[in-house]
């Protein structure tokens, strides 16, 4: 079944996303957590026991790894705060993962652009060669 079939799970995921986003911006003081950290998506299991939080960090690979490490170390505090603010029997265990889909998208765009430019250059060169060959025949 799709996630749309479970509106309670979706509502809980959105609420967790809002709470943790606010905490990252205002409450967490861990210097390892980059200021430019965004929550991309939160997936909560149907039994509401686990929540996977996908984050994006603006920075180099070291900053990304440090941010994930800082969030993992702070997960107990974050979970306690989430549990205080949501109305659920259980507070899901929080699993932080780095979402690299944006970087992959940029990389794929660059690859496609390079291939397209190469094709255009080759077509231009072949057209010029054909034109010069036609002039020589005249």
Curated annotation (Swiss-Prot):
It is found in: Cytoplasm. GO terms for biological process: maturation of SSU-rRNA. Keywords: Cytoplasm, Ribosome biogenesis. InterPro entries: KH_dom-like_a/b, RbfA, RbfA_dom_sf. The keyword Isomerase does not apply. One of several proteins that assist in the late maturation steps of the functional core of the 30S ribosomal subunit. Associates with free 30S ribosomal subunits (but not with 30S subunits that are part of 70S ribosomes or polysomes). Required for efficient processing of 16S rRNA. May interact with the 5'-terminal helix region of 16S rRNA. This is Ribosome-binding factor A. It comes from Alkaliphilus metalliredigens (strain QYMF).
């Amino acid at each position: 079944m799709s996630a749309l079939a479970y509106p309670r799970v979706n509502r809980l995921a959105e609420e967790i996303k809002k709470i943790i986003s606010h905490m990252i911006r205002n409450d967490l003081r861990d210097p390892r957590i980059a200021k430019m950290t965004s929550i991309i998506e939160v997936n909560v299991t149907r039994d509401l026991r686990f929540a996977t939080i996908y984050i994006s960090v603006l920075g180099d690979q070291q900053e990304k790894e440090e941010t994930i490490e800082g969030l993992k170390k702070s997960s107990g505090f974050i979970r306690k705060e989430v549990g205080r603010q949501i109305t659920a029997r259980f507070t899901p265990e929080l699993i932080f993962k780095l979402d690299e889909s944006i970087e992959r998208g940029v990389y794929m765009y660059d690859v496609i652009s390079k291939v397209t430019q190469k094709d255009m250059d080759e077509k231009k060169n072949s057209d010029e060669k054909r034109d010069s060959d036609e002039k020589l025949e005249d």
